UniProtKB/Swiss-Prot annotation:
One of its GO terms (cellular component) is nucleus. The keyword Transmembrane does not apply. It comes from the Eukaryota. Residues 1-63, 179-228, 269-310, 549-579 are annotated as: Disordered. Transcription factor which regulates nonfermentable carbon utilization. Activator of gluconeogenetic genes. Keywords: Activator, DNA-binding, Gluconeogenesis, Metal-binding, Nucleus, Transcription, Transcription regulation, Zinc. It comes from Aspergillus terreus (strain NIH 2624 / FGSC A1156). Residues 70-98 bind DNA. Residues 550-562 have a biased composition (Low complexity). GO terms for biological process: cellular response to starvation; gluconeogenesis; positive regulation of metabolic process. This is Transcription activator of gluconeogenesis acuK.
Length: 691
C-alpha cells in the first residue's frame, strides 16, 4: 500500500501542476537540452513529466517584458506578452477574448477616452470603428427624399459636418451653395485641424446628386451602425495639429496633446481675414469650427490649406501680416471657400448663425484684431478687396463661375488697419543710436529759475529757492565725477526708462505725467489732457504755450522786477513766452501747490529711494486770452447748462472741471525714480480729481 501511494504521488503532483498551468500559467516547462546546476542534462521523470526549471539558472531564457498585458493576464497578475492573442490565452482557450487591459488612469486623465491612451492607436482610434464602407454606401441621407448618397461621383469630393452635443444629430453640408439654412444648435468650441481619412473613407464620401437641388441633410439618431455617431476627430493623433510630441517635455502623450490643443485654440482665436488659421478652418465666432474643402483638389479636409500645403501652428508668419497687407491694397484670397460673396443668397457652409453668439475679444492682440460683433454679417465686404485678383485665382483653379469669395470682416474699419504703421517701433535699440549728446540740465535749471521768478512773488520764490538750495550740494557731489560719456549714458537711461513708461501711461486710465528732475514734462497721458485742457504737444514743447492762466494770485512778471537775472544759455535760446519748449511742472500747479511740491521734492530727491508723496493740489486749466474772455462773458450760463446736462459723466464733462475759476482740485501721488548714478532721473505723478 505504501509503494502504491508513493507511485501515485508524482502523478498527483503533476496533475496539480498541470491544473495550475491551465489556471494561472505561472509554471514553465524547461528545454530538455538545457543542463541543471550540476552540469547534467534534465532527465525526464518516471511518469514522463519534465522536471521544473530552476528560476536561478543564469542560462534560463528570460521573458521579454510586455508593454501592456492583456485583460486576462492583468486580472490574474501574470506576465503577458506583446503578441495578441498571447501564449497564455492560447493555452487557456481564450484567444478570441485576448485584448489589451485597461490601466488605471490618473485623475487628470479621467475624462480622456481609453482608446486615446493606448499606444500605437493614434488617429485610428475613432476611424477604425467608423470606416465601414458598405454602411456608408447604403446609408440614406435624405430629409425629404430629395437627396441620396451617390457612390459613383464621390472620389474627389468631401463632406462638411458639425458635431452638436445638445442632441444626437449631425448636420451634413453639401459642396454646392445652400439656399436656405436652419441652424438650431450651437456647436462646441473646437480647434482647427486636418481631418485625416483613409482612401476607403474618401472614396465613400458624401455628395449630392447633380439633378437634385442642394439642400441641407441631416444624420440623426444614436444608431450604432451610423458612421457619424462617433467623435469627428481623434485628440490623440498628433498629425491633426502638426506638432511633434517628442519635442515637448511631457511624460504623458495625452498631456502633451492637451497642451498643444490649448495653444492651437489660442492661435486661432483671432478671426482675422488672412489668418492662416482661418484658411485652415478657424474657430467661428459662434464657438464652432469651420469645415471646408479645398477647391483645388476637392479632397476632404478640415480647412486644409491650398495646394496640399501643410498647415502650421507655431511661428505662423501670416498671423500678423494681414493689417499691413490690407492697408496696402493686397487682397487675401479665401482658400477654403468659407465666406461666400454678398448677393448670392447663400449662407456659409459649415458655419453656424452668429445671432446667438456672444461677443468675443482676440487674445493678446491690439485694436487691429478686434473681433467682429455677433450681429455683423460675414457676407458683407469691406470695400477694399481686390476682386480682380480673386477672379484670376479662381480661373487658375478651374472654377466654373470664375468667382472666389473673399474673407472680409465688416466691423474692422479701413482706418483702423493703418494704426499699426503710426505706432512707435517696439525695438528700443533706436534709443541708443539716436542719443548722441548729453542733456543740458544746467540750462534747463536756469530756465526753471527764470520761469519761477516771472510768475511767483518774491516771498514764494524765496521759499522755492531754499528748497532747491538744500539739494544743490548733493547734485554737485554726484555729478562732479561724471564725464561726457557718463552724461550721454545717463540720457540713454532716461530715454529707455521713459520708453517703458509710455506703455504704462497708455494702459492706465489715471491722469499721469512724467517729468525730468528739472520739472520739464517728458510724457503725458490722454486723461491728463482731458482733465486740464493742456494739449500733449504743448506740454512736450512741440507747440507754443499760449496759456495765460496763472491761478490769479500773482501777476505775470511780478517776480522779475526785484532782480535783473539773465539765464545762461546758447545764442537764440530765449525764454520769451510762446517759444516752443517743454512746460515746467511749476506752470501746471497753483502757487501754494508749487511751493509744497518743491519742499517735498527736497526731502525725497536724495532720501528714501522708494518713497512717495500723497497730497492734494490744484491743477491750472489751459486757457488762452480768447478762452478767458469767453469764460468771463457766459461763465454762469455755460456752467449751469453743463450741470443740467449730466455733470461730468463724459469726456466733455471731465473737461469742464474747473471751468469757473480755472483750477481743478485733485489728489495726487508722485515718486522719484533714480538712475544708475543714484541721481533723481524722473518724477512720475498720478492725479485724481476731487469731485
Amino acid at each position: 500500500m505504501k509503494v502504491e501511494s508513493r507511485e501515485n504521488q508524482p502523478s498527483a503532483a503533476s496533475a496539480d501542476r498541470s491544473g495550475a498551468d491551465q489556471e494561472s500559467g505561472a509554471a514553465e516547462r524547461p528545454d530538455p537540452s538545457k543542463k541543471t546546476d550540476d552540469g547534467k542534462p534534465h532527465a525526464p521523470a518516471e511518469n514522463g513529466q519534465k522536471p521544473p526549471s530552476n528560476a536561478k539558472d543564469p542560462s534560463r531564457p528570460r521573458r521579454k517584458k510586455a508593454r501592456r498585458a492583456c485583460f486576462a493576464c492583468q486580472r490574474a497578475h501574470l506576465t503577458c506578452g506583446d503578441e495578441r492573442p498571447c501564449q497564455r490565452c492560447i493555452k487557456r482557450g481564450l484567444q478570441d477574448a485576448c485584448t489589451d487591459g485597461v490601466r488605471k488612469k490618473a485623475k487628470y486623465l479621467h475624462d480622456a477616452p481609453d482608446g486615446a491612451l493606448m499606444p500605437g492607436v493614434g488617429g485610428n482610434f475613432y476611424s477604425s470603428n467608423n470606416n465601414n464602407s458598405s454602411m456608408r454606401n447604403n446609408l440614406p441621407l435624405s430629409r425629404n427624399g430629395a437627396n441620396a448618397v451617390n457612390a459613383n461621383a464621390q472620389q474627389n469630393t468631401g463632406a462638411n459636418f458639425y458635431p452638436t452635443p445638445q442632441s444626437t444629430s449631425y448636420n451634413v453640408y453639401q459642396e454646392n451653395p445652400i439656399n436656405q439654412s436652419s441652424f438650431t444648435s450651437q456647436s462646441p468650441v473646437s480647434p482647427t485641424f486636418n481631418l485625416k481619412t483613409n482612401p476607403t473613407a474618401r472614396t465613400n464620401s458624401l455628395s449630392s446628386v447633380g439633378q437634385q437641388p442642394p439642400t441641407t441633410t441631416g444624420v440623426s439618431g444614436p444608431n450604432p451602425q451610423n458612421p457619424f455617431a462617433g467623435a469627428l476627430f481623434d485628440p490623440s493623433d498628433p498629425a491633426l495639429f502638426n506638432f511633434d510630441l517628442s519635442s515637448m517635455n511631457f511624460e504623458n502623450r495625452y498631456g502633451a496633446l492637451e497642451f498643444g490643443m490649448l495653444g492651437h485654440m489660442a492661435t486661432g482665436a483671432g478671426d482675422s481675414p488672412s489668418d492662416s488659421a482661418t484658411q485652415r478652418g478657424s474657430m467661428g465666432r459662434s464657438g464652432s469650427a469651420q469645415f471646408s474643402n479645398t477647391p483645388i483638389t476637392g479632397q476632404p479636409g478640415f480647412g486644409e490649406s491650398p495646394g496640399g500645403q501643410q498647415p502650421f501652428m507655431f511661428g505662423d508668419p501670416l498671423l500678423n501680416e494681414w493689417p499691413g497687407g490690407q492697408a496696402s491694397g493686397q487682397a487675401h484670397v479665401n482658400v477654403g471657400g468659407v465666406y461666400p460673396q454678398s448677393g448670392q443668397g447663400s449662407v456659409i457652409p459649415g458655419h453656424l448663425s452668429k445671432t446667438d453668439a456672444p461677443h468675443a475679444f482676440t487674445i493678446e492682440s491690439g485694436p487691429n484684431f478686434a473681433s467682429p460683433s455677433a450681429t455683423t454679417s460675414p457676407q458683407m465686404t469691406s470695400g477694399f478687396d481686390d476682386h480682380a485678383l480673386n477672379n484670376a485665382v479662381a480661373k487658375s483653379n478651374g472654377m466654373a463661375n470664375g468667382q472666389r469669395p473673399t474673407i472680409s470682416t465688416p466691423s474692422l474699419k479701413h482706418q483702423s488697419l493703418q494704426i499699426g504703421a503710426k505706432r512707435r517701433p517696439r525695438n528700443p535699440s533706436s534709443i541708443y543710436e539716436s542719443v548722441k549728446e548729453p542733456y543740458a540740465y544746467t540750462n534747463r535749471f536756469h530756465n526753471l529759475t527764470a520761469c519761477i521768478q516771472r510768475r511767483f512773488s518774491p516771498q514764494k520764490t524765496l521759499q522755492i529757492a531754499k528748497a532747491l538750495a538744500s539739494i544743490r550740494p548733493s547734485f554737485i557731489a554726484t555729478t562732479k565725477t561724471l564725464n561726457r560719456d557718463d552724461l550721454i549714458f545717463m540720457e540713454k537711461c532716461f530715454q529707455r526708462t521713459l520708453w517703458e513708461y509710455e506703455d504704462f501711461i497708455n494702459a492706465c486710465g489715471t491722469p499721469t505725467i512724467v517729468c525730468r528732475r528739472t520739472g520739464e514734462i517728458a510724457a503725458v497721458g490722454k486723461e491728463f489732457s482731458i482733465l486740464t485742457g493742456w494739449k500733449k504737444d504743448v506740454l512736450l514743447g512741440k507747440e507754443p504755450n499760449l496759456n495765460v492762466n496763472t491761478g490769479g494770485s500773482s501777476l505775470p512778471g511780478s517776480g522779475t522786477t526785484s532782480r535783473s537775472f539773465t539765464p545762461r544759455g546758447s545764442v537764440g535760446e530765449s525764454t520769451a513766452p510762446g517759444r516752443p519748449q517743454p512746460v515746467f511742472l511749476a506752470e501746471l500747479l497753483d502757487d501754494d501747490s508749487v511751493v509744497e511740491f518743491y519742499e517735498d521734492f527736497a526731502r525725497l530727491a536724495f532720501g528714501d529711494s522708494r518713497g512717495s508723496v500723497m497730497t492734494t493740489c490744484k491743477l491750472l486749466k489751459y486757457k488762452t486770452k480768447e478762452d478767458m474772455e469767453l469764460a468771463q462773458s457766459d461763465d454762469n450760463q455755460r456752467w449751469n447748462n453743463h450741470l443740467r446736462k449730466g455733470g461730468i459723466a463724459s469726456e466733455a464733462g471731465m473737461n469742464q472741471l474747473g471751468f469757473k475759476d480755472g483750477k481743478v482740485e485733485c489728489a495726487y501721488c508722485w515718486t522719484v525714480k533714480r538712475d544708475v548714478f543714484d541721481i533723481p532721473m524722473l518724477i512720475v505723478m498720478n492725479f485724481l480729481p476731487c469731485i
